A protein has these predicted regions:
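Cytosolic juxtamembrane N-terminal segments of multi-pass membrane proteins
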Residues: 10-29, 147-149
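Inner-leaflet juxtamembrane helices
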Residues: 69-125
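Alpha-helical transmembrane segments and their immediate juxtamembrane boundary regions
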Residues: 23, 27-93, 157-186
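Hydrophobic alpha-helical transmembrane segments and immediately flanking/interface helices
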Residues: 133-159
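Short, charged cytosolic
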Residues: 1-20, 126-142
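Short, highly charged low-complexity linear segments
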Residues: 87, 106, 110, 138-148, ...
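Generic structural signal of hydrophobic/aromatic residues within well-ordered alpha-helices
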Residues: 50, 121-125, 139
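Short, flexible segments with low predicted structural confidence
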Residues: 2-5, 10-11, 54, 65-67, ...
């Protein structure tokens, strides 16, 4: 097979490349999850404070209604995007022996094997170990899909941060406008 992995000299450099790339992907995923956790905490705290302190004051001061609703909506939307960035997507979890024999599955991702019998999983891993093309192809595919998941996480996080940042500015401006341009209730 021309151009196959078997023809290449797969030394320490290639192993280091895969190891480093995997580590980088895992670290970036951890960073994204930490950022999402921070946004979850901040927005949950703001929502709690607003609901406990501002919402009860709205009947006595109508000027608080619109800015409070804006702030709650912003925090809720940011919260949803933070949750979306951490929400796992798990596949069916069962690769067949035929999938393995045809090299159509990736046993390196738990979502592809968690419902398989141990014997079938073991057989599949042994098949992969015996075939370096299958092994490196699986590792490459795994890295690719890790990258796809990371891109989605960071896309949701970017939206979360933008909603929070710009929404906070709009909410503060709404509070300022409400108190500067509308008279206080009597």
């Amino acid at each position: 097979m021309k151009g196959s992995m078997k023809e290449l000299n797969l030394g320490r450099g290639v192993e280091t490349m895969y190891r480093t790339t995997y580590r980088t992907h895992v670290n970036l995923s951890s960073i994204a999850d930490n950022k999402a956790n921070i946004m979850l905490s901040i927005n949950a705290i703001i929502i709690s404070i607003v609901v406990a302190n501002l919402v009860p004051k709205i009947p006595g001061d109508y000027r608080l209604a619109v800015p409070t609703l804006i702030l709650l909506a912003v925090c809720l939307i940011a919260l949803v995007y933070a949750i979306l960035s951490t929400r796992p997507k798990v596949t069916q979890g069962r690769a067949t022996r035929e999938d393995i024999a045809q090299k159509r599955t990736n046993l390196l991702f738990f979502g592809n094997f968690y419902r398989m019998d141990l014997a079938d999983f073991h057989w599949g891993m042994m098949e992969m170990i015996k075939d370096s093309d299958f092994l490196y192809s699986s590792m490459t595919r795994d890295l690719y899909y890790l990258g796809v998941v990371l891109a989605k996480k960071y896309q949701y996080l970017r939206i979360c941060y933008n909603v929070f940042m710009y929404g906070l500015i709009v909410a503060v401006a709404a509070f300022a406008a409400a108190f500067l341009f509308w008279p206080a209730p009597v």
